């Protein structure tokens, strides 16, 4: 499982049926790979909930999202598992089947909520417009395999 965390001043996701937005917090781009499990979702959710990605008065990254009353916008992103080794068109065989991936994606979002976080989401498996107003920028990539952070 791969999650790109971007610290944002604001972010939104829209399509024909959806309009979700947050102010200060994280925009998460969430990729579910062939081998991704609920254990991977758990360890990444814990890391994100406790990650100190906001500055204190000395410009040190000392505050987590809860301490800043931030929110999360979680967007599924199967293209994080693109295979670009051959040719010019990416392949996506490393991404988990959508029927299985959506279950892990929803489990992951619920795991974040279990830490008391406000989580808004995109719509799994649809084309969306994602607007991200980065803060910093601060961008961290979390990867887990076999329930362990890589």
From Swiss-Prot:
Top-level EC class: hydrolase
One Gene Ontology molecular-function label: Gly-tRNA(Ala) deacylase activity
Designated gene of the protein: dtd
Name of this chain's protein: D-aminoacyl-tRNA deacylase
EC number annotated for this UniProt entry: 3.1.1.96
Catalytic activity: glycyl-tRNA(Ala) + H2O = tRNA(Ala) + glycine + H(+); a D-aminoacyl-tRNA + H2O = a tRNA + a D-alpha-amino acid + H(+)
UniProt remark on domains: A Gly-cisPro motif from one monomer fits into the active site of the other monomer to allow specific chiral rejection of L-amino acids.
Main location: cytoplasm
InterPro entries: Daa-tRNA_deacyls_DTD, DTD-like_sf
Species name: Staphylococcus aureus (strain MRSA252)
Intervals of motif Gly-cisPro motif, important for rejection of L-amino acids: 136-137
């Amino acid at each position: 499982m791969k999650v790109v965390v971007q610290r944002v001043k604001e972010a939104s996701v829209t399509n024909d049926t959806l309009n979700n937005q947050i102010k200060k917090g994280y925009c998460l781009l969430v990729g579910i790979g062939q081998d991704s499990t609920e254990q991977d979702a758990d360890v990444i959710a814990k890391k994100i909930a406790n990650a100190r990605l906001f500055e204190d008065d000395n410009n040190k990254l000392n505050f987590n999202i809860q301490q800043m009353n931030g929110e999360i916008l979680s967007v599924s992103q199967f293209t994080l598992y693109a295979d670009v080794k051959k040719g010019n068109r990416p392949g996506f065989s490393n991404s988990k089947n959508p029927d299985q991936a959506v279950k892990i994606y929803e489990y992951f979002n619920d795991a974040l909520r279990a830490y008391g976080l406000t989580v808004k989401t995109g719509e799994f498996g649809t084309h969306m417009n994602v607007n991200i107003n980065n803060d910093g920028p601060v961008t961290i990539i979390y990867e887990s395999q076999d329930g362990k952070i890589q």
